[in-house]
Amino acid sequence: MKNRILLINLGGPRDTSEIEKFLIDLFEDPLVFDLPLPEWIRKPLGKWVAKKRAPKVAQTYKSMGFGGGSPLVSETSKQANAIAKALEKITGEKWEGNITMTCGYPDIRKLNRDFLVPTKQNILLPLYPHFSRSTVLSTAKLVEQTTKFCPVSYEGWVAPFHSSQVYLESIRDLILDFFQNRLNRKDFLHSDSFQGVSNWETIDLIFSAHGIPIRLIEKGDRYREEINSNVENLKRLLYEKGFQGKCHTSFQSRVGPSKWTEPNTITMLEQLGKNGVKRVAVYPISFVSDHLETLEEIGEQLKKIAYNNGIAEYHRIPAPGIYPKFIEAMAKIGLESIQSSKNECICKKLGGHFPNLKSGECPINF
């Protein structure tokens, strides 16, 4: 059997024709569109919401300049190839990099079972640094539908990696290389504006994470806790390297009227402007590749809000993408997953428990 690593991400439409399929997959998922409704109501409602949002979302995708779609799939493919090469360099063996998406294409539901069974020769890497029911648990459940067993406690399944030292150091170095204009622009999208940051040591740094509904936190989801821990660890590493600016944590991409994790990044920028802050950099802490939420939301929409609130200097720090130190970190984290048996239900441990589960029952099978 050949060595393989499968990168799993949420997904994004590659062109306009895939937008509706992407949104339907997203809103039909009971762990994403998590409403206290009977399934016979929730699922059709999710499909209706997806169809209604599709035309508006299409305009936003069009504005990014990638043919009416998202670059996420192509960026994930680049990451898979780069990580496979890094694995070959570390192990001296041949590795094949593959990708699949939980929403849209390439569709994880259509993938051959052999690719979805985690083993020492078949690593499954969900590209989520932090646990959430709406991402990691959703992914594991989709894998289980094909494999007929929960994958998360098996060798070859990569758990959320926000606390990994090699990951943390790679993100610290990415931020510092951005500040000091040392990034290879060819490795990043929309990089024409990358010119370094004067007096970077004292700029205000916002770690902006994708928000989730508070109802998930109330069910025990530890996503917010892991985001906060991630920020604290990065702050420590940055301060050790001479950074002295204030660090802030906020949440973006809220959808719908329900209460989401706070503070919202919009509110954060408004408050910083009100407090007289003039220089801000924003890092997308919950994302590992650039797409709609980083290029358009952080890069354009939030920038306008910052300027409108008196902030004179605004920088979008890119997601890691194929940044070499990040790629090496992911390869090492992947190998760590096959070197020790976890034999524990991380979904339940990290907030995937459901009230109706019996003791010892896996939440994947709820």
From Swiss-Prot:
It is an enzyme of class 4 (lyase). It comes from the Bacteria. It catalyses: heme b + 2 H(+) = protoporphyrin IX + Fe(2+). The keyword Iron applies. InterPro entries: Ferrochelatase, Ferrochelatase_AS, Ferrochelatase_C, Ferrochelatase_N. GO terms for molecular function: ferrochelatase activity; metal ion binding. Fe cation binds at residues 210, 293. It is found in: Cytoplasm. Pfam families: Ferrochelatase. Its EC number is 4.98.1.1. One of its GO terms (biological process) is heme biosynthetic process. Belongs to the ferrochelatase family. PROSITE patterns: FERROCHELATASE. This is Ferrochelatase. Transmembrane segments: none annotated. The keyword Metal-binding applies. Keywords: Cytoplasm, Heme biosynthesis, Iron, Lyase, Metal-binding, Porphyrin biosynthesis. Catalyzes the ferrous insertion into protoporphyrin IX. Pathway: Porphyrin-containing compound metabolism; protoheme biosynthesis; protoheme from protoporphyrin-IX: step 1/1. One of its GO terms (cellular component) is cytoplasm.
